[in-house]
């Protein structure tokens, strides 16, 4: 019997980084794994660690800026608050313990981009700022896009300082 993906579990070198296989866990936050905490709880840290333990080469942690939302189940973590940062560092450490690379999902600050979208008149779930409903937005001006690039860079640097190996955008 021939394997469809014979190299799936083989190591791969991407740039200067060697991944133990080609399994990548994208961002996931189970909605009910924690309450309203704005930092990764032990349960969420264990969730990410288990993905690494199960064999993923890269585990992506979601940790965007908190926003006011109409979704009561929205899980928005806050990596920018100093007293929360050690918990994000524990996520990276737990993922590293099982031999995986820790990735951090960088998302736009919805407080900045609310009301804007990629183009005028396109129905989008991102216009409302929380994904709760689709609305028509207006095209983001160039200045806002440059500001977002700066914010992405700052957040990526912060994640790196807390032990994350890469960012997912």
State each model region's role.
Residues 1-169:
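Flavin-dependent oxidoreductase catalytic cores
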């Amino acid at each position: 019997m021939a394997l469809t993906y014979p190299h799936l579990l083989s190591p791969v070198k991407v740039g200067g980084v060697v991944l133990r296989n080609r399994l990548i866990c994208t961002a996931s936050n189970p909605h009910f794994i924690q309450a309203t905490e704005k930092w990764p709880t032990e349960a969420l840290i264990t969730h990410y660690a288990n993905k690494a333990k199960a064999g993923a080469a890269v585990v992506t942690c979601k940790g965007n800026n908190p926003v006011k939302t109409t979704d009561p189940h929205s899980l928005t973590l806050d990596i920018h608050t100093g007293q929360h940062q050690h918990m994000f560092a524990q996520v990276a450490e737990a993922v590293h313990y099982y031999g995986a690379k820790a990735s951090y999902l960088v998302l736009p600050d919805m407080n900045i981009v609310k009301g804007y979208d990629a183009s005028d008149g396109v129905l989008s779930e991102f216009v409302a700022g929380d994904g709760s409903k689709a609305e028509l937005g207006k095209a983001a001006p160039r200045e806002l896009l440059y500001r977002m690039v700066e914010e992405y860079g700052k957040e990526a640097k912060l994640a790196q300082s807390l032990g994350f190996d890469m960012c997912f955008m």
